[in-house]
Design a protein with these regions (language model features):
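Nucleotide phosphate-binding/pyrophosphate-handling subdomain across enzymes
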Residues: 1-97
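C-terminal helical cap/extension that packs against the catalytic core
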Residues: 6, 44-46, 88-146
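Flexible, gly/pro- and Lys/Arg-enriched active-site loops
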Residues: 8, 23-26, 30-33, 99-120, ...
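Active-site-adjacent beta-strand anchor residues
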Residues: 49, 77, 129, 149-150
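Short glycine-/acidic-enriched loop or helix-start segments at secondary-structure transitions
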Residues: 56-57, 84-86, 110-111, 158-161, ...
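Cofactor-binding loop segments of dinucleotide-utilizing enzymes, especially the Rossmann-like FAD-
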Residues: 76-80, 102-103, 151
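Glycine-rich phosphate-binding loops at beta-strand->alpha-helix junctions
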Residues: 80-82, 106-107, 155
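A glycine-rich beta-strand to alpha-helix segment
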Residues: 134-164
């Protein structure tokens, strides 16, 4: 998207459209579940379908940029065929709490598998629940400032449904 930045030569020739309408269209574009933020019960909640190590690192960068010095509780559920040990251990490096869960799909890793894969520092609390609903309910009762639901699309979708959050916001 660098081509959409002001001052990039020949933007209008490359995209065959004036710069301002393209910029405005991009500003209105929504990516549900991609660093989607809202407030629920006085708690900042972030939904992000980070389901590979690169996406987890991007999520962590965004969290530290947008919420510096804030404690984070992660609700995580991953598919069994993903690199969840690397992702969980990256999260554990910054998390105050990690709540593991299993979305309702046969492809999902079991909470016990996730728990065995993570080696958190002493100050990071790790718990596990058999469902996303139970994990989210526990996370809302937790003390960290930020609740971040991440992992698979299934996990984020179930959490959004449990919390009554729409995947898109109205632009009107």
């Amino acid at each position: 998207l660098r081509i959409l930045e002001p001052g990039v030569p020949d933007v209008e020739q490359v995209v065959s459209a004036p710069y301002a309408p393209v910029r405005d269209a991009c500003a209105r574009t929504q990516f549900p579940g991609r660093f989607q933020c809202c407030m629920i019960g006085g708690k900042h909640v972030v939904f992000d379908v980070a389901h590979n190590p690169s996406a987890i690192h991007a999520l962590l960068h965004s969290l530290t940029h947008c919420y510096p010095e804030r404690s984070v509780c992660f609700v995580c559920g991953f598919m069994a065929d993903k690199e969840y040990p690397a992702m969980l251990n990256a999260l554990a490096g910054v998390a105050a709490e990690i709540i593991l869960c299993r979305p309702d799909t046969i492809r999902a890793a079991l909470p016990s598998q996730l728990s065995e894969a993570v080696s958190p520092p002493e100050e990071c609390i790790v718990t596990a629940f058999e469902s996303v609903d139970a994990a989210v309910a526990a996370a809302l009762r937790s003390s960290p400032d930020i609740l971040c639901v991440t992992g698979s699309f299934y996990t984020v979708g179930e959490a959004m449904s449990a919390l009554g959050v729409s995947p898109v916001t109205s632009l009107t």
